[in-house]
């Protein structure tokens, strides 16, 4: 009984420390929703920030689940959609996740759209990897040489990962009812390297975040549903699941979202589920 009381007290203290600073700094945030010119009700499950059209300005890429994908850019103090090409807006593929990073090392970020037209397992439409050539948008997954490893499994989240620490990015795809994917450019072809990187696990993937969690390179934390969470430690560019050792498997709970933050300003990173850390 005493142990239980101590455990509950620790939870209360943790929540207090988490919430109380936010109360003090609430005035730091300002609601700018009115700056969005067209903002009807819609289903949007993902957002990323990148320079969509190579004009030197950052834009918001907002996914549409049965609605148009948007690229919101500031014009005269207002956020307006600047992309209307079908290959980008693509309302019928039901985009649920998005991430942007420079996969082909051309100096500009590509946009990975994770599409999900079914709840779990095999889906009809593959994902898109959008590149802008200066005039029009292209889906690199529609290039013949890149079709070998298309993702045809329902998914929920994507994250960009620089696993080697040299600026070479890959995309971790958290699938639901099928194996995880990890896409990289290799010999000028987009390939799935999940098997050789020890990432090809089957689960109900929900959320994923990448960062310097427990090593000096980018690690991966994946919150899952109907199964254990994954905590992948970067082991010289490959990954080792250490969720059990760090007690973040949480098999009795369904993960939905996750984030990394130095919530105590202590130079330690924490996930939303447990105290995974690194030293600054």
PLM features per residue range, with description:
Residues 66-67, 120-125, 177-178, 224-227:
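Short, solvent-exposed loop/turn segments at conserved positions within beta-propeller repeat blades
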Residues 45-54, 95-105, 155-165, 206-214, ...:
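Beta-propeller blade termini
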Residues 270-275, 279:
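Conserved small/polar residues in nucleotide/adenosyl-binding loops
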Residues 56-60, 107-111, 138, 167-169, ...:
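Glycine-aliphatic tripeptides that mark coil-to-beta-strand junctions in extracellular
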Residues 26-42, 73-93, 130-153, 170-172, ...:
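Blade-edge motifs of beta-propeller repeat domains
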Residues 2-13:
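Bacterial N-terminal signal peptides that target proteins for export
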Residues 36-63:
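Beta-strand-rich domains and repeat architectures in extracellular enzymes and scaffolds
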């Amino acid at each position: 009984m005493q142990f239980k009381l101590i455990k509950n007290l620790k939870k209360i203290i943790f929540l207090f420390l988490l919430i109380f600073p936010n109360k003090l700094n609430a005035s730091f945030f300002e609601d700018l929703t009115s700056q969005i010119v067209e903002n009807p009700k819609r289903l949007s499950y993902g957002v990323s920030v990148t320079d969509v059209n190579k004009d030197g300005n950052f834009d918001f890429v907002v996914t549409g689940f049965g609605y148009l994908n948007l690229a919101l850019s500031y014009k005269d103090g207002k956020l307006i959609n600047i992309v209307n090409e079908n290959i980008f807006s693509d309302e019928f593929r039901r985009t649920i996740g998005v991430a942007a990073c420079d996969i082909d090392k051309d100096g500009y970020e590509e946009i990975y759209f994770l599409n999900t037209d079914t709840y779990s397992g095999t889906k009809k439409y593959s994902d898109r990897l959008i590149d802008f050539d200066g005039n029009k948008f292209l889906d690199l997954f529609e290039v013949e040489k890149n079709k070998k490893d298309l993702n045809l499994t329902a998914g929920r989240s994507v994250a960009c990962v620089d696993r080697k620490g040299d600026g070479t990015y890959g995309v971790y795809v958290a699938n639901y009812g099928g194996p995880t994917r990890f896409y990289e450019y290799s010999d000028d072809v987009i390939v799935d390297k999940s098997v050789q990187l020890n990432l090809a696990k089957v689960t109900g993937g929900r959320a994923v975040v990448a960062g310097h969690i427990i090593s000096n390179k980018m690690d991966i934390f994946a919150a899952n549903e109907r199964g254990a969470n994954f905590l992948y430690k970067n082991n010289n560019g490959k990954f080792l699941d250490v969720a059990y050792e760090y007690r973040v498997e949480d098999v009795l709970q369904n993960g939905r979202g996750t984030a990394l933050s130095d919530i105590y300003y202590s130079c330690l990173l924490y996930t939303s589920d447990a105290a995974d850390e690194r030293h600054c």
